Structures are given as C-alpha cells and as structure tokens.
A protein has these predicted regions:
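A short glycine/serine-rich beta->alpha loop
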Residues: 140-146, 335-336, 445-448
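Residue-level preference for non-acidic, small/hydrophobic
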Residues: 134, 153-160, 224, 256, ...
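A short, well-structured edge-of-sheet supersecondary motif
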Residues: 116-140, 365
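Small-residue-rich helix-loop
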Residues: 137-139, 404-555
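Short active-site loop at a secondary-structure junction
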Residues: 139-159, 164
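N-terminal secretory signal peptides that target proteins for export/translocation
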Residues: 1-61
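Conserved serine DD-peptidase/penicillin-binding transpeptidase domain
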Residues: 84-117, 163-436, 545, 552-555
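Hydrophobic helical h-region of N-terminal Sec-dependent signal peptides
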Residues: 64-79
C-alpha cells in the first residue's frame, strides 16, 4: 500500500480555493489572491527528502496552472465510480482491537493536554492505525459511539464520490410552457427546476440567465415558477440547529440553494469621509439605508455598526446601517442567512434577470414543471470533486446536506429524504465491506446531536477510502495541517506542518479530528479522535499533540 500522500491516480491538480472559503465573492477573491501568492504545490513546505520519498517514482505528479473565472476552481479528477476497482482486501476486514492496543493507553503528552483542559481521558476516543493495516496501534474507547461533529462529512463525501463519481454534475434547468413572440415575450410561465446544486452562486446563475436570453426570451408574460420536487418538502426550511437563526452554518438544504442562502454586507470607510456599504449577492427588492459616518470611536463599536438592522415592509426588505465607523477599522464583512429559500432564490434570479431589462409580469410560486413544458436552458454545476474539496476544506454544512440528499435522489428516486439517503449510504458501505455498525446518520453534515459514530468505524472508512479509486479526490479535499482550510492556523510551527490531511469537527462540547498523517519515519497513519465533554473547547491542544506524536512515529 503506497503512502496516502503519494497519489494512486496520476492527474493534474490545483490547490486554488473557491467561493466557499467565505460567503461572498469579495472574500473569495481575497482568498484566491492569497493562494496565488502561495507555493504552487501544497506540500512545498516539506523537506526535499520527504518529497522525494513520497512522490518518486510511483507518483509522477504534474502540476498545471488553474484558470480562475471569478472565484471558481478548475480541478481534474479520478475516474468515475462506475469504473471502480474491487476494494482492497484489508478494507473488507472488520477491525479487530488487540489487547495490546487496548492497554496501550493514551500518549503521556496527550494526557497532559487533557489535564490542562480539565477533560477526563474517559471523554476522549482515539484510534491510530497504519495505512493499509486496520489493526490499531492505539484503540482508546474505540468502539464507543460519539458525536463526530463535522468529521461526519467524511462519510457523506466518500459515499458521494464513490456512488456518483468525481465528475458528477448537478443540473439547473429552465422551462417554458408557452410560445415566444417575435419581440421576445414568453406568453406563459418561466419554470426553474433545481436538483440541489450546492454551489449555485451568482457567477453560476448568471450562466443560466444568459442562456434563457439566448433562447430569445426578454420578457415573461406569466410568472416565475420554482420546481423543488427533487427533495421532499419535509427537508426544506427546517428549524435552525441552535438559536442563531441568521448564522450561515444553520442554513438547511434546498433543491434551488442559491449562494448558500446568505448575504454579505461589506462596510468600507473611505479617505473622503464616507462609509460605503456593498452587498453580495444582489437581491431584488433589497434597499440599503446607509446612515454610517466616519468618526473617531472604537473599532469594538464599529463591529456593531457594521451589522445591519433588517426591516420588511411588504415585498421590500431594508437593511439599515447607522453609527460611527472609523477609517482605521478598515473593511468589515457581515454574513447573514436571511429570508426563506424560495424568496432568496427568486430575488437573486430577478436581480440578475432585470440587469439587462428583463421583466416577469406574474408572481413567484412553487410548482412542478408541467409535462408539456419544453426545456430552454440548462446550467451544469461544477464537478462533484470540486464540491467535495470545498465541503471538506472549509466544512460547509449546507453543501454537505445538499450532497447527502442528492445521493438518495440519484441512487434512489426523487423526492429525496434523509432516510432514503441513509439507506443508500448504508447499502454502499455494506457492499464494499466497510464495517460501521454504530453509524447513525441524520443530515450527513455533522451539524446534529443525533449523528453518532465510533472512532473505530470512521477509521475503517478512512482505510477503505485510501484504497479506493476515488482516493486522490478524497484525500486532496482534506485540510492540510498548517497550510489550508480549517487546519490553516493549526500546527504551523510543528513538524507535522504540511504532513497531515485532517478533517476537523466542532460543536459545543465536541471536538474531533479524522484523517491521515505522513510520519517522519516514512509510515502513513490513519487517525480518528473525538472529545465529547463540557470542556472540549479547551482541549484542542490534546488533538494537536496527538498529531505531533503520530508524526514522530506513534511511539
């Protein structure tokens, strides 16, 4: 078994991140600019000796420049899942915990970190294995079902890549049910049918709008009808996970998810004494009441001034800003989840449609596309491999939830439900001999108090993923310690810097890590660890210490 950092599938790669790093185009452009200045290869921080060990001669990796259109990422991926090989025999063996692994206990450095955080060792579970060998080196509370937080995304993304294939694309289709006059007026309704594209952002939706115009339609005499039948109605506009209903991480899934149903307000003071407010994405019927002025107050008070007060008056929504905003505080962006999915998509679509004088005379409604309607435009979203990259690098909940439901819809039959998706994923795991008897799926993102899995089960999935045809797309999607994603600011001065692909997980009272470590000894390791405790937030050092210990040789 080759080490996980030596890709088993030879293809070109790109490490340029996308729109997902933030919820606005402006933030994404800043991230793209930063990455453009970074080393071309994500392992550039490794010593030359490590690179020669890991990438020669088997993994002759060729890098090519990635063209960035706006903030989208161009990636090449492994063969589709329908061409997958027989799973590695080790992936089919149910994990067996030896007495030595059970008795090994936690490393002393990890115990010290737990003690400092006031977290008992009983609140932590750990499994460490060599890649290709499911016999654990450490198995601490290995079989205990735990809250995994966002490490549950590993189950959803590996299943998605394997079942749908890395080249899978979502489709968003426009239909018309009437004739188009010579002057460009559609005598009927315009229908938009979604299939759950997790990354339908402004620069993607404008492609659909342009194609509708190219079909000869300038005006719509009827209404705008949104077909959301791909997901069951029970999956949409759900209660938020916690009390912060405006937090983007709380946005639920939707077949016509647009811009993550979140709006970005950026406040920027200028040398002329004025304070500008910019909004992304543009929404119809949204007005800005800007009463900000450039003063000499504190930047702490400026944070409050940068957060708008939202007021609805019929169809109009007004975002009001007021107060002192000093020049020295610089630009500040506030991301808010607002409106319901239908209203958000409709207003986003109308804003783009109206830019070149387009009109829709009738109301916005939900409904199925009639059988007599004809397709007039289709937008294909980014490939699944790119979406999985964003889901795992930046731990995007709503993208994971849309992928989770898509798995059920494609492998089963629409409308998708969480139960249907869970059955499809369980059947996939069973077919491929991946033993996860304690797995409990809810929404596939980890943003749940109902999802559970043991460290031993998740380690079995990581072993199988590394031995699969989608190994490279999967491993490439995981944050690299000290380099990018949710691990960018961790272990930046440690030996493990650049030598671990780790998915993180965070909830109140939960901290989790899961992924792969390339050890200094030339061995590659699988690691999974969960901490479920009231003081879990203070125990991040225990996980960082564990990763350093593994990198040093796991002994």
């Amino acid at each position: 078994m080759p080490p996980i950092v030596a890709p088993r599938i030879l293809r070109a790669t790109s490490a340029i991140s996308s729109y997902l790093s933030h919820l606005s185009l402006q933030c994404a452009l800043r991230r793209a600019a930063r990455l453009a200045r970074a080393p071309a290869f994500p392992y550039s921080s490794m010593p030359i000796s490590a690179l020669s060990t890991r990438f020669a001669p088997r993994a002759r990796v060729c890098l090519r420049a990635a063209a960035v259109v706006a903030t989208c990422t161009a990636l090449a991926f492994a063969p589709a899942a329908h061409a997958r090989k027989k799973p590695h025999k080790d992936a089919r063996r149910a994990p067996v915990v030896s007495a030595a692994a059970r008795d090994a206990g936690l490393p002393a450095s990890v115990l010290v970190a737990l003690q400092r955080a006031k977290v008992p060792a009983s609140a932590m579970s750990v499994v460490v294995e060599r890649v290709g060998d499911p016999q654990p080196l450490i198995a601490w509370n290995a079989n205990r079902p735990m809250l995994p937080a966002s490490t549950m995304k590993l189950v959803t993304t590996f299943a998605g890549l394997s079942i749908l294939g890395p080249e899978f694309r979502w489709r968003t289709t426009a239909y018309a049910d009437g004739p188009v006059d010579p002057d460009g007026t559609l005598q009927g309704n315009l229908y938009i049918k979604g299939t759950g594209d997790p990354k339908l952002v402004p620069e993607e939706l404008i492609d659909l709008v342009d194609k509708i115009r190219k079909a000869g339609i300038k005006r719509v005499a009827g209404g705008l009808v949104l077909d959301k039948s791909y997901f069951a109605a029970s999956t949409r506009d759900l209660p938020s996970f916690d009390d912060d209903v405006s937090a983007p991480y709380n946005v639920g899934p939707d077949p016509l998810l647009y811009a993550f149903k979140a709006i970005s307000f950026t406040v920027t003071p200028g040398e002329d004494g004025k304070v500008a407010v910019d909004v992304l994405p543009p929404l119809a019927n949204l007005s800005i009441d800007n009463q900000l002025y450039e003063g000499s107050g504190s930047c702490a008070s400026a944070a409050a001034a940068a957060r708008p007060t939202l007021n609805a008056d019929g169809a109009m929504l007004t975002a009001s800003f007021a107060g002192d905003y000093p020049l020295r505080c610089g630009a500040r962006t506030t991301n808010l989840a607002i409106l319901d999915h239908t209203t958000f998509f409709a207003r986003g679509f109308l804003a783009l449609w109206q830019q070149d004088g387009g009109t829709i005379a009738g109301p916005v409604a939900e409904g199925k596309v009639p059988s007599a309607a004809r397709p007039i435009a289709v937008h294909h979203g980014p490939v699944l491999g790119s979406v999985v990259y964003d889901i795992n690098k930046f731990s995007n909940n709503v993208m994971a939830r849309n992928l989770f439901l898509t798995i059920g819809a494609v492998a089963g039959k629409p409308p998708a439900t969480p139960e249907q998706s869970s059955r499809v994923i369980r059947a996939f795991l069973q077919k491929n001999g991946i033993a996860m008897p304690d797995l409990v799926l809810d929404n596939g993102s980890g943003l749940s108090r109902d999802e559970h899995v043991s460290a031993l089960s998740l380690a079995a999935l990581l072993q199988a993923a590394n031995a699969s045809p989608v190994a490279q797309a999967f491993v490439d999607s995981l944050p690299i310690a000290g380099i990018d994603g949710t691990m960018k600011n961790r272990l930046t001065n440690a030996g493990v810097l650049g030598n671990a692909h780790i998915k993180t997980g965070t909830l109140r009272d939960v901290r989790a890590i899961a992924g792969y470590v390339a050890g200094a000894d030339g061995q590659s390791y699988v690691v999974v660890s969960f901490i479920n405790d009231d003081h879990a937030e203070a125990a991040r050092a225990a996980h960082d210490t564990l990763l350093e210990w593994i990198y040093a040789g796991a002994h």
